[in-house]
UniProtKB/Swiss-Prot annotation:
Source lineage: Eukaryota, Viridiplantae, Streptophyta, Embryophyta, Tracheophyta
Protein's organism: Pinus koraiensis
Keyword flag Cell inner membrane: no
Bound cofactor: record note: Binds 2 [4Fe-4S] clusters. Cluster 2 is most probably the spectroscopically characterized electron acceptor FA and cluster 1 is most probably FB.
PROSITE patterns to which the protein is assigned, alphabetical: 4FE4S_FER_1 (PS00198), 4FE4S_FER_2 (PS51379)
Entry keyword annotation includes Iron: yes
Membrane-protein topology: Peripheral membrane protein
Example GO molecular function: metal ion binding
Identification of the protein by name: Photosystem I iron-sulfur center
Top-level EC class as recorded in UniProt: oxidoreductase
Domain 4Fe-4S ferredoxin-type: 2-31, 39-68
Location within or outside the cell: Plastid, Chloroplast thylakoid membrane
Complexes and interactors: The eukaryotic PSI reaction center is composed of at least 11 subunits.
Amino acid sequence: MAHSVKIYDTCIGCTQCVRACPTDVLEMIPWEGCKAKQIASAPRTEDCVGCKRCESACPTDFLSVRVYLWHETTRSMGLAY
């Protein structure tokens, strides 16, 4: 069951989410949109275990990184019955 990991442009490039991830789903990539000149990226979402530690570690009030668990995604799309 794959989970969806979304990174939003409110990311400040602090690397807290990357360091919190126990399965190395996240990594930092160059980005000119913030002072740190980097943003989190989720190239390995198939390894996400859905622990949401990245969300908890995010210091922004906007939750720049969100994990949508497989069953939450299904429910929000109206596919659950």
